Amino acid sequence: MAAKDSKLAGTGKVTALGTALRPLNSEYGKVAPGWGTTILMSVFIGLFAVFIVILLEIYNKSLILDNVGVNWLSSTGL
């Protein structure tokens, strides 16, 4: 396996973009200890679910908003 890796090490082209993105790849395979950002991610998923439910209620007209028309037809009559 080491011989194969040494062959691949010399191949490829060094680019400015690759050099700039190299620090992002240095964390590959590492796992944050504990729960990490799971709680924050769960909060955002919950907020997104509430947003989707509100949109569905507006679309189904089960959430009535005063003075907000939901007419999908063009008002110009084209």
Curated annotation (Swiss-Prot):
Signal peptide: none
GO molecular function, one term: phosphate ion binding
GO biological process, one term: protein stabilization
Pfam families: PsbH (PF00737)
Transmembrane segments: 39-59
Membrane topology: Single-pass membrane protein
GO annotations of cellular component type: chloroplast thylakoid membrane; photosystem II
Gene3D superfamilies, per the entry: Photosystem II reaction center protein H
Keywords: Chloroplast, Membrane, Photosynthesis, Photosystem II, Plastid, Thylakoid, Transmembrane, Transmembrane helix
Subcellular localization(s) per the UniProt record: Plastid, Chloroplast thylakoid membrane
Family the entry assigns: Belongs to the PsbH family.
Known role: One of the components of the core complex of photosystem II (PSII), required for its stability and/or assembly. PSII is a light-driven water:plastoquinone oxidoreductase that uses light energy to abstract electrons from H(2)O, generating O(2) and a proton gradient subsequently used for ATP formation. It consists of a core antenna complex that captures photons, and an electron transfer chain that converts photonic excitation into a charge separation.
Subunit structure: PSII is composed of 1 copy each of membrane proteins PsbA, PsbB, PsbC, PsbD, PsbE, PsbF, PsbH, PsbI, PsbJ, PsbK, PsbL, PsbM, PsbT, PsbX, PsbY, PsbZ, Psb30/Ycf12, at least 3 peripheral proteins of the oxygen-evolving complex and a large number of cofactors. It forms dimeric complexes.
Stated name of the protein: Photosystem II reaction center protein H
Organism of this sequence: Ostreococcus tauri
